[in-house]
Amino acid sequence: MEFDYDKLSSNNITAPMDRLFKRVEIMDMDLLLNSTRNLDDDQLYSLNYLVDYVKQHKKALLTNIPVPDPVFLKIFGSAGTGKSHLIRLVSQWVELIMRTEGDNPDVPYIIRTSFTGAAASAIDGQTLHSSFALNFSGASTSLDDKKRDKMRHILRNLRVVILDEFR
């Protein structure tokens, strides 16, 4: 798989058609707190684990201390157990913690992806290949300086990648 860099516009990287990732639209704080309170113990543990990680990461960025090592967390559960709901709440909290006034909302801190369109839709995300404009032709695509710089700009804030339905 290679990145299809030609899908990136050479104009304005924040134009809606150039946006690689869906924005996380922050919900009303009362609704967010209420939804968080209604998580079961396992969901709350997972949310707190990720929120603590993101807080440590932000503190490291602000104080110039070493950034914590990346984490890989797998959430298991059968259909209807609230995995998609948990992913949406994690997205909300990551955005609330990391985003500062003046940040470009099209430069994400978190992205939600999945291998299938149905799973991506359930988490208000995108398929992995559409998120990163991956092509499956097998042809290698070289990256010129302008496109490389554009990708760096778009991905500079990225701290959390969610891949739903990962087996």
Indicate residue ranges for each PLM-predicted region.
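Conserved ATP-binding/catalytic motifs of P-loop helicase motor domains
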Residues: M1-R167
